[in-house]
Structures are given as C-alpha cells and as structure tokens.
From Swiss-Prot:
Gene3D superfamilies: 1.20.5.170. Residues 194-257 form the bZIP domain. One of its GO terms (molecular function) is DNA-binding transcription factor activity. PANTHER family: G-BOX-BINDING FACTOR 3 (PTHR45967:SF1), G-BOX-BINDING FACTOR 3-RELATED (PTHR45967). Keywords: Activator, DNA-binding, Nucleus, Transcription, Transcription regulation. Coiled coil: none annotated. This is Transcriptional activator TAF-1. Residues 35-46 have a biased composition (Low complexity). It comes from Nicotiana tabacum. Its main location: nucleus.
C-alpha cells in the first residue's frame, strides 16, 4: 500500500521518471529536486497536511491509504518505492481522487492546475511499472520559468536599442517645442513690425491733426485781430476827415480876420 505525500504550500513538486514520454524543462527538474529533498520533512509535519496542496501521488496504492495519509500525514517517503503492484483501474481511481483533492484544496488555481496536469500526463496508457505524478503548480512559480521572462516597463526592448534617438525624441515633449521655434519667432517678429508701423502711422496722424488744429486756431486769432484793426482804421479815418474839415474852417476864419485887419489899417 502506498500513502499520499503532501508538500509544503506554495512549493510545486513533481517527479517523472525519464523514458516514459515526458519532456521536462530545466526549471521543472530543479523544482523536482527541491521537492525530493523536502519530502521527509513534509511527511513528518501533521499540521501542513490540511493546508498543503496535493502535489504527487506515486504508485498504485488504494484510496483508503491515500485518505489515511491525508488525515494523519505520517506516511514515509520510502513507502512510495516499496511496491509497484496494482492495476490500471486502481491507478485511475487514485488519480481521479487526487485530482478532486487538488481541486478542493486549490479552488483559485484550478484552471492552471488542470492545464498543467494535461501537459504533464503521457498520452498513452499507463503501465503497471510507470509512476504517475500529479503536479499542482501555482501560477507565477514554475510557469514563469517555463514560459519565459515578463517584460517590465523599465526594460529596454530591441527596438529602443536599435533606434534610441527616435525613442528619446518621442518620449520627451520638450524636444517637440525645440524642433520648430523658427516659424513662431518669424511670425512674432513680423507682427511686431506691423504693430510698430501702425503705431508710427497713428502717431503721425495724431501729430498732423494737432498741427492742423493749432494752425486753425492761429488763423482764427489772426482773423479776429484783422477785424479789430480794420475797425480802428475806420475810426481813425473818420477822425482825420473831421480834423480836415476843422482845418478848412479855421483857414476860412483866418482869411476873414486878415481882411478885417487890412481894412482897419
């Protein structure tokens, strides 16, 4: 009879004998080596049996022995190598019960464990001498090593290595403003020239208007002065005429007085 072995939670373990149609990657083989070292320690701990993952069930043991190993966790790893007897039906029942137990213990990662079990199991019929391994793999542990590396935002891709200048130009928004500063400057200078020209024209118009108003005011003042001077001239002429009349009268009086003097002498 063979007992079930429970690994520490989060440690994917598995063991596939070579030559039975299974191809193992280096990452999976490293996980298997680490699992074989931790079998003895995990079998002795009864507390980890309830919270651990069912990772491997070896041999063709009965279902009763597997349940006893799950409840008590005291089965030794040496029991897995004692006997290779059994039948295909017992092996199928053990594998189905172990699959069900693995699905019950890990409900979140059921899809990933099923896909990994399908990849790990051979396509042909299971022989009596072959050992069956059911590996429950958590996503992010062995899958990352098998599938490849995950690109992070800080990693430099091949396109960035080939064209570093273009990527820097695209990444930095300040370069966009530095590429075309000429056109806005020229337009700004032309607009400034137009503004200066308009200001100059406006100042010329203002100065011409001020000079015109000043000349108009001076002309009005001169017209007023001319009118006043003409009025004074008319008054002077009238006074001159009066004086001439007075002088004529005085001349007549003088002539009359001279005749009287001649007559009296």
């Amino acid at each position: 009879a063979h007992g079930g072995v429970y690994a520490h939670p989060g440690v994917p373990i598995g063991s596939h004998p070579p030559g039975h149609g299974m191809a193992t990657s280096p990452a999976v083989s490293q996980a298997m080596d680490g699992a074989s070292l931790s079998l003895d320690a995990s079998a002795k701990s009864s507390e980890n049996s309830d919270r651990g993952l069912l990772a491997m069930s070896l041999g063709n043991g009965s279902a009763d022995n597997i349940e006893g190993g799950a409840d008590h966790g005291n089965s030794q790893s040496g029991d897995t190598e004692d006997s290779t007897d059994g039948s295909d039906t017992n092996g199928a029942g053990v594998s189905e019960r172990s699959k069900k137990r693995s699905r019950e213990t890990t409900p979140d990662n059921s899809g990933d464990s099923k896909s990994h079990l399908r990849r790990c199991q051979p396509t042909g019929e299971i022989n009596d001498d072959s050992e069956k391994a059911i590996v429950a793999v958590r996503p992010g542990k062995v899958g990352e090593k098998v599938m490849g590396t995950v690109l992070s935002p800080s990693m430099t891709t091949t396109l960035e290595m080939r064209n570093p200048a273009s990527t820097h130009l695209k990444a930095s928004p300040t370069n966009v403003s530095q590429l075309s500063p000429a056109l806005p400057n020229e337009a700004w200078l032309q607009n400034e020239r137009e503004l200066k020209r308009e200001k100059r024209k406006q100042s010329n118009r203002e100065s011409a208007r001020r000079s015109r108003l000043r000349k108009q005011a001076e002309a009005e003042e001169l017209a007023i002065r001319v009118q006043s001077l003409t009025a004074e001239n008319m008054t002077l002429k009238s006074e001159i005429n009066k004086l001439m009349e007075n002088s004529e009268k005085l001349k007549l009086e003088n002539a009359a007085l001279m005749e009287r003097l001649k007559m009296n002498s």
